[in-house]
């Protein structure tokens, strides 16, 4: 009987040592990230929100790379202002390379002056370029190196979403970011494609 308790104790010790490392510096990103393959149209199908005003749904982003290899992006999505005023907002972003090809500094701003602007880390956690991408940004770190204010997008080339197999892979990577069950699905109903110009910013 003693050996049974010994096995239980070993299992408990093993489980404790296998705890996730939620420090931002420990997060894996896409190896050998290729900006050119990543360029093009992406539909945001799920997101983890940061603090503050943020695009809510119908979010479409288009990434491009110029002849000098610099990446930029434009995005459009629905945002709610003053509780009941819904508009389609345009955002612009430029990216500065770092030593890691999957980690960028992203300077972004809204075409309308009251929309958010900033200069955030922008990491590509994973992508296969053809179907899905998982992006992550940490705006503020705690003293222990974990993230105090983050946001993350799940992108798809198809507005209808991802296959079950790809969703399982994305969920695994979300867990590695310590963000499981913190995402919400994003609706795509053509809202920003059907709005008159007076409802756009």
From Swiss-Prot:
Disulfide bonds join 22-178, 88-192, 138-147. One of its GO terms (cellular component) is extracellular space. SUPFAM superfamilies: Lipocalins. Residues 1-18 form the signal peptide. The modification Omega-N-methylarginine is found at residue 139. It comes from the Eukaryota. It is found in: Secreted. PROSITE patterns: LIPOCALIN. It holds the Pfam family Lipocalin. Its main location: secreted. The keyword Disulfide bond applies. Keywords: Disulfide bond, Methylation, Retinol-binding, Secreted, Signal, Transport, Vitamin A. InterPro entries: Calycin, Lipocalin_ApoD, Lipocalin_CS, Lipocln_cytosolic_FA-bd_dom, Retinol-bd/Purpurin. PANTHER family: RETINOL-BINDING PROTEIN 4. Retinol-binding protein that mediates retinol transport in blood plasma. Delivers retinol from the liver stores to the peripheral tissues. Transfers the bound all-trans retinol to STRA6, that then facilitates retinol transport across the cell membrane. Belongs to the calycin superfamily. Lipocalin family. This is Retinol-binding protein 4. It comes from Mus musculus (Mouse).
């Amino acid at each position: 009987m003693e050996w049974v308790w010994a096995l239980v104790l070993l299992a408990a010790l093993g489980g404790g040592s296998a705890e996730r490392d939620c420090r931002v510096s420990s997060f894996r990103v896409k190896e050998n990230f290729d900006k050119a393959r990543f360029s093009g149209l992406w539909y945001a199908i799920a997101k983890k929100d940061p603090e503050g005003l943020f695009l809510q749904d119908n979010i479409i982003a288009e990434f491009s790379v110029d002849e000098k290899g610099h990446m930029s992006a434009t995005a459009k999505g629905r945002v709610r202002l003053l509780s009941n005023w819904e508009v389609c907002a345009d955002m612009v972003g430029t990216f500065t390379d770092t030593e890691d090809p999957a980690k960028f500094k992203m300077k972004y701003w809204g075409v309308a002056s009251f929309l958010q602007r900033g200069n955030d880390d922008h990491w590509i956690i994973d992508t296969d370029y053809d179907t899905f991408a998982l992006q992550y940004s940490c705006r503020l770190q705690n003293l222990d190196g974990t993230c105090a204010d983050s946001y993350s997008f799940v992108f798809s080339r198809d507005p209808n979403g991802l296959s079950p197999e790809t969703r399982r892979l994305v969920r695994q990577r979300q867990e590695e970011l310590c963000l499981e069950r913190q995402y919400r699905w994003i609706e795509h109903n053509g809202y920003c494609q059907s709005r008159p110009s007076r409802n756009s910013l």
